[in-house]
Design a protein with these regions (language model features):
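The substrate-binding groove and active-site-proximal loops of carbohydrate-active enzymes
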Residues: 54-61, 199-202
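N-terminal substrate-binding region of glycoside hydrolase catalytic domains
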Residues: 24, 28-41, 51-56
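Histidine-acidic metal/acid-base catalytic patches
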Residues: 1-29, 78, 112, 137-154, ...
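Active-site acidic/histidine proton-transfer and metal-coordination neighborhood
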Residues: 4, 15, 19, 58-151, ...
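Conserved radical SAM core fold
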Residues: 55-56, 88-92, 186-190, 233
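A generic structural signal for well-ordered alpha-helical segments
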Residues: 25, 42-45, 74, 118, ...
């Protein structure tokens, strides 16, 4: 099956003009770009999604409004998916770990409004279950999916730490999966860099053959977007060069997918 391979324009790409980022990624062999809010005012095609990772637990109205802005920008640019989190985002300075009912009410209430705005704009909202947030494993993600009409951005790396069965989750959520992140990890629940790390594709504990087979079984034909978060390698080996990271990752994707060399 031919797959659309995308790359999240994070890392030091966020400091570069959108046209330069897009051209660099297309030259590196990608089919599209997953933009972040760093480029929300200059979104260019081809694009797979717009990532808007606001903290809906403690961010209040400003977090919801920022997501509204992302939805409107995506709609104007012809981007069909905006990726979101519940929060709190524990990797951000000053973030506080919360798992109380007030936090859940804030996150679910914000997501309900965001879902309504997405529906009005014709943009799907992809919730990413993510470490350090309320929706971080199968059970907490399911709580959101049962309560709010949002879809799923599926990142298998986060379920490595929680021990949830990745292929089974893909089949459970099926048609609600609208975006997929290519990222690997190993470790246990805790803090990034201490208890677990995100590593190179194929070097962690994501069961890639089974994961890809599950995607085939549900008929997933959406984008697969590389999220490069092997930060130590990025800084110490690649010298903070995002183009080098993108090229390296594209080769790893080709190996995972069995693409001809």
């Amino acid at each position: 099956m031919s797959r659309e391979i995308s790359f999240i324009a994070a890392l030091d790409f966020e400091d570069r003009p959108a046209a330069e980022v897009r051209d660099s990624l297309l030259e590196a062999g990608y089919d599209s770009v997953e933009w972040t809010m760093a480029h929300v005012d200059e979104l260019l095609a081809p694009a797979s999604a717009l990532a808007c990772q606001q903290d809906l637990v403690t961010g209040g109205e400003s977090a919801v409004e920022a997501t509204f802005r992302a939805i409107d920008a995506a709609a104007e640019a012809g981007i069909g998916v905006v990726n979101v989190l519940t929060g709190p985002n524990l990797w951000e300075e000053g973030a506080v770990d919360r798992d109380d009912e007030e936090a859940w009410a804030a996150a679910l209430g914000g997501l309900e409004r965001i879902s309504e705005r997405g529906g009005q704009a014709g943009v799907e909202i992809g919730l990413e279950p993510c470490w350090g947030t309320l929706a971080h494993d199968a059970a907490t993600a399911q709580r959101v999916l049962d309560a709010v009409d949002v879809q799923v951005t599926f990142d298998p790396s986060h379920f490595v730490m929680t021990g949830d069965p990745i292929p089974e989750l893909i089949e459970r959520w099926g048609e609600r999966i609208v975006h997929f992140h290519l990222k690997d990890a190993f470790g246990r629940p805790g803090m990034d860099g201490e208890d677990f790390i995100f590593c190179m594709l194929g070097e962690g504990k994501v069961p890639w053959p089974e994961t890809l087979a599950a995607l085939d079984r549900i008929g997933y034909q959406g984008p697969m977007s590389v999220e490069f978060e092997a930060y130590r390698y990025y800084e110490q080996v690649l010298g903070g060069d995002p183009i080098a990271a993108a090229r390296l990752a594209r080769g790893q994707v080709a190996a995972l997918l069995g693409e001809p060399s």
